[in-house]
């Protein structure tokens, strides 16, 4: 191995090597250890439908930061990885591939052959996903990797289904469901995305059967009129009291339907009368149930009109809409049209408009399951970070309807329901029955449908640990500690995991839900294929390194909020890594002799604190304070604040200050002091690497390998940073007096540098400083005087007692506890300043003249908006004040030049 880090920071030189070292040495493996506390995160399983996107990179980085943090704290930290079969999404992809490569439909292949190709897809893309996770630095326990359709998960799914069925919580019924005509399957309510779109309301007259005027009804879906079975009005709506109980005629169709009274219609909306089509609207379905109305379907599962639509049979629903409205208009039934913004439900996968349809499907009764999940949040057993997402969680549970869990697909967990083909007996069993439980026939057929993907994902936190078996992993690692997830799948996944866990294990699946936002592009738009603004994390890693990407993501996001992906933030993160690299090279170089052996260092454990210089105590106290802050913010999931504090500590305090101060000692003649300086450098650098490791694991581990090793640890025989111990805050490492002294000196240095920059004076130009201190501060400044002079290039510091003693013609700056004055004669190049001020005067005179000209123009003052006129008046005042100051300054400088 080389004796020092490479001269140039290039993550490609070591990131893959470091990851292979970790994995081959079992650094990610979590043991069931009664002497340690467990910490568990289950990875939200990415779909096997392609490669990871930037949202996955964020999600996984946050989880890895927490896992590495807890591992360093001494927990047996398990991050359990896996992937999701993603029933609809994967089937769509596989069907598309078969069409393109084989020119076939899935029905041409048959179920068995199709599933072979789906499993081939899983092998291909599942492997790609795990490779991408490894590139990111995910410290998952790959020995426990799971898949939502592996044998263990399938066993858990069947067990859960049968358990709910036998409790009466799963049933099969003919109910209204969401149907995607494109995917050819039912969808749960959570899988329907609602979006407001510009639409139309058509107002049609339904004539009274007795020859009266009847009633006018507004609808946004006239094509469903063929399925109308009633007109509903509110019982308190006086306009329609005489119509209730009578019949009206369905226009052009001629069928009579009743007018009924029901609380559903809103008298203030439309005409107050609502057409009731139970087979094609969920609200109408509920009305139909209350009034025992017939369910008439006029649209088939391919979104085409059926025989109930008469001459429109076979037409697409939207083609029918146009033709039907045209015919109604020509027949005189269309009263008016009205443009409206209408909420439209779309399939979350293909974005086809969903059709409410009556269908025989499997459902989960949700009322009983939802109650414990609601109580878990209200009692504090389950907390959300940030807290506001608890309202979202509770709202969804309190408004929940029965969950449609059957899907008309082939890829997924097949429903464990079996039908006797001879007597029709239904059997729900964990394993396929050999014969009918009623008639003994062996002619048995399994239900063709598969389960909703989220049914198996709902069991993920405990099925992955061996449930329903009482495994050692389940006993030790469950319940898990935190679920890290985006706010976009609280409905889909989080809620279902909670009620499933409470029903099966009696415990919440995790104690905390850390909710993060989305990664948007630089303009704040959601990343998508259609916009072409998606960013491949692997390309970013190739260009900047995984550490830079991870640090940018963790420090750029706050819980629950979206973040914008900006290249300059990546550049900043990479620059930070480069700064740490170069500082570490300097430290390592000064630890070694000419032969590459480590020089002697003081033993800080037994060292008399008197041997430490003030700057040593200051940096040790700063690391100690940072340890406390970073630990506390990490525990609260404020990862951005923790990462930023690590950045400030390393860049601003260690690199910019401590290293610069300590250089003189390292190059000096006092050998004992050198030993102390080396020891402090090593201690501080090691502690900072520990603090930064969860965020930037690769660079910190690489630097760690070049530093002196401590005593061998049974838990970490090879001395890897990933298995080290997290720093612990100690009151003994607080040095308030020395910290005050150094920080006062640093503030003074920064103020002098700012004065130099303002005066355009070179750093090499020696200056004198006059300081007016606040009460009790002069001794502090004097004690730190030796730290000020060299970095600020100050030859002399003098102290004054009051403002009356301030020299004439100075530039000044204020810092906490003191005011600093630099004589103009020291800092100013009067010839250059004279030239600058003359130019500034000329420019300001021009601005004053321009504004005065505008304001003296009566046409401008009378015609321009009052706001614009006031703005110009304000500009005149500002420019005149600036000109007066420049003229005063010019007079002083002119005297100096003369």
Placement of each model-derived feature along the sequence:
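Glycine- and acidic
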Residues: 1-5, 44-52, 111-115, 140-147, ...
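Short Cys/His-rich metal-coordination motifs, predominantly Zn2+-binding knuckles/fingers
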Residues: 183, 253, 350, 421-423, ...
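Structured ligand/cofactor/substrate-binding pocket environments in proteins
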Residues: 55-67, 74, 83-84, 153-156, ...
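N-terminal, positively charged nucleic-acid-binding surface of large information/translation enzymes
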Residues: 1-236, 260, 277-290, 294-309, ...
């Amino acid at each position: 191995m080389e004796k020092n880090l490479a001269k140039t920071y290039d993550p490609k030189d070591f990131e893959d090597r470091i990851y292979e070292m970790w994995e081959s040495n079992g650094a990610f493996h979590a043991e069931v250890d009664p002497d340690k506390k467990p910490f568990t995160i289950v990875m939200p399983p990415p779909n096997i439908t392609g490669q990871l996107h930037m949202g996955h990179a964020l999600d996984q980085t946050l989880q890895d930061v927490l896992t590495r943090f807890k591992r360093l704290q001494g927990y047996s930290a398990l991050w359990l990885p896996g992937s999701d079969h993603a029933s609809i999404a994967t089937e769509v992809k596989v069907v598309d591939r078969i069409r393109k490569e084989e020119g076939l439909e899935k029905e041409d292949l048959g179920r068995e052959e199709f599933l072979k190709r789906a499993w081939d897809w899983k092998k291909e893309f599942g492997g790609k996903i795990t490779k991408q996770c490894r590139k990111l630095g995910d410290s998952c326990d790959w020995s426990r990797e799971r898949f939502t359709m592996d044998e263990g998960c399938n066993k858990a799914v069947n067990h859960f289904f049968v358990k709910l069925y036998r409790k009466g919580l799963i049933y099969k019924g003919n109910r209204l469901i969401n149907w995607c005509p494109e995917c050819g399957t039912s969808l749960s309510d959570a899988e329907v995305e609602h979006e407001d779109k510009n639409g139309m309301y058509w107002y049609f007259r339904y004539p009274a059967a007795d020859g009266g005027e009847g009633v006018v009804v507004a609808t946004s879906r006239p094509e469903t009129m063929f399925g109308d079975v009633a007109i509903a009005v509110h019982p308190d709506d006086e306009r329609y009291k005489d119509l209730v109980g009578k019949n009206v005629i369905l226009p052009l169709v001629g069928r009579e339907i009743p007018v009924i009274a029901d609380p559903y219609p809103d008298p203030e909306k439309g005409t107050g009368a609502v057409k009731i089509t139970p087979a094609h609207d969920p609200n109408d379905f509920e009305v139909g149930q209350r009034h025992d109305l017939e369910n008439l379907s006029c649209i088939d599962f391919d979104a085409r009109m059926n025989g109930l639509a008469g001459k429109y049979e076979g037409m697409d629903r939207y083609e029918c809409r146009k033709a039907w409205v045209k015919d109604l208009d020509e027949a005189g039934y269309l009263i008016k049209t009205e443009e409206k913004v209408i909420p439209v439900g779309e399939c979350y996968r293909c974005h086809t408009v969903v059709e409410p349809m009556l269908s025989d499907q499997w459902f989960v009764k949700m009322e009983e399951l939802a109650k414990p999940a609601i109580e878990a949040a209200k009692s504090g057993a389950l907390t959300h970070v940030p807290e506001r997402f608890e309202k979202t969680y509770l709202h969804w549970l309190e408004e929940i309807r029965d969950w449609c869990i059957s899907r008309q697909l082939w890829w997924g967990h097949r429903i464990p329901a079996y039908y006797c083909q001879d007597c029709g007996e239904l059997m729900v069993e964990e394993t396929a029955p050999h014969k009918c439980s009623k008639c003994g026939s062996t002619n048995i057929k399994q239900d063709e449908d598969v389960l909703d993907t989220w049914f198996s994902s709902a069991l993920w936190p405990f099925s992955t640990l061996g449930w329903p078996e009482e495994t050692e992993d389940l006993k030790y690692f469950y319940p898990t500690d935190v679920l890290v997830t985006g706010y976009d799948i609280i409905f889909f996944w989080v809620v279902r995991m909670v009620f499933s866990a409470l029903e099966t294990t009696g415990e919440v699946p995790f104690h905390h839900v850390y909710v993060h936002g989305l990664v948007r592009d630089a303009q704040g738009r959601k990343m998508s294929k259609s916009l072409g603004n998606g960013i491949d994390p692997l390309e970013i890693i190739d260009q900047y390194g995984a550490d830079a990407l991870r640090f940018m993501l963790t420090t750029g996001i706050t819980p629950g909020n979206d973040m914008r992906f900006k290249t300059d933030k990546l550049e900043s993160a990479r620059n930070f890594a480069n700064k740490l690299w170069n500082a570490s090279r300097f430290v390592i170089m000064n630890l070694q002799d000419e032969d590459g052996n480590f020089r002697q260092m003081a033993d800080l454990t037994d060292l008399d604190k008197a041997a430490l210089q003030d700057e040593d105590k200051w940096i040790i106290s700063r690391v100690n304070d940072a340890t406390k802050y970073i630990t506390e913010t990490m525990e609260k999931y404020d990862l951005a604040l923790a990462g930023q504090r690590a950045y400030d500590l390393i860049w601003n305090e260690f690199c910019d200050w401590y290293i610069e101060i300590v250089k003189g000692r390292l190059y000096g003649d006092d050998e004992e002091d050198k030993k102390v300086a080396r020891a402090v450098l090593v201690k501080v650098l090691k502690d900072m690497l520990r603090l930064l490791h969860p965020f930037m694991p690769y660079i910190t581990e690489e630097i760690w390998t070049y530093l002196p090793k401590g005593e061998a640890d049974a838990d970490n025989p090879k001395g890897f940073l990933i298995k080290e111990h997290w720093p612990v805050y100690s009151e003994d490492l607080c040095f308030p007096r020395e910290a005050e002294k150094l920080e006062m000196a640093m503030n003074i240095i920064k103020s002098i540098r700012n004065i130099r920059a303002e005066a355009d004076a070179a750093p090499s130009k020696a200056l004198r400083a006059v300081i007016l201190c606040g009460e009790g501060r002069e001794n502090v400044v004097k004690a730190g005087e030796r730290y000020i002079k060299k970095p600020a290039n100050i030859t002399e510091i003098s102290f004054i007692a009051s403002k009356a003693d301030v020299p004439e013609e100075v530039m000044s700056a204020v810092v906490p506890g003191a005011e600093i004055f630099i004589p103009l004669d020291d800092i100013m190049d009067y010839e250059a300043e004279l030239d600058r001020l003359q130019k500034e005067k000329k420019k300001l005179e021009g601005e004053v003249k321009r504004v005065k000209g505008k304001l003296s123009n009566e046409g401008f003052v009378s015609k321009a908006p009052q706001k614009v006129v006031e703005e110009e008046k304000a500009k005149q005042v500002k420019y005149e004040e600036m000109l007066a100051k420049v003229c005063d300054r010019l007079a002083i400088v002119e005297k100096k030049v003369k």
